């Protein structure tokens, strides 16, 4: 039953990553002015899911998951490199955070939501959030 639960989780995560990617593509196709944040989210989430699913697949296959006779080991290596290509996931997270800060700073209630002691930090982040 545990393997069934892992397979279900793997399918759910893969489907969620797929739909986030579709949402990004749909925004771009519709001519959205800025898809930077959702593109970074899609890349980061989908590649994290790919590594998690590949890792779980290695676990499901047990010792065979590490053997080169089976494709699982290659899938894991391929998934891992996806987190590095076209900007590491850490860089993608910075892009996402800067866009979130930029969006938050454009709202009137920005100053009322950010405590005074953090205003300088967020103000500095706001200036560098021009992505």
PLM segments and residue spans:
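Alpha-helical interface subdomain recognition
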Residues: 1-131
